[in-house]
Amino acid sequence: TPNDMARVKNTGHNRAINRHQWNAEDLSVALNNQRSPHANCLSALKALIAIRQQQPAFHPNATQYTLNCGRSVFGFWRQSQDRRQSIFCLYNVTRTVTHVALASLNLVGNNTWSDLISGSSVDLDGDDPMLTFEPYQAIWLANLTL
């Protein structure tokens, strides 16, 4: 939803900028228009939820640790309860392209790693393999995909 400047003005609260209040009919129209940003956002969120539901490392009781990936990337590592699946959840929180050295993640080299979101594989070969992030891109790097 775009910034709701009228709501900020009416309430006097800056946080109201992202607190748009929908009526049911307008929301239904927006979500049923497949070309609307609202329908696209909902579709993308549903796809991410479907991916998460299939991955044991996203179980609520799975192990989780935050990672130090520098100032541009927020990350955390999750491991399934049976320890078979690891997922590195990495988020570029900037509006610029950024890179993370795969060596900094301590990936197990004998596993095949792929991004659950894009479906692309990650090549661990080379002298200094890197992950490249587009602005605000998320990568869920997993050793076992289901």
What are the residue ranges of the model-derived segments?
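Conserved active-site loop/cleft motifs that coordinate metal ions or position small ligands
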Residues: 88-91, 115, 141-142
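Short, low-complexity, polar/charged sequence segments that are solvent-exposed and flexible
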Residues: 94-96, 107-111, 131-135
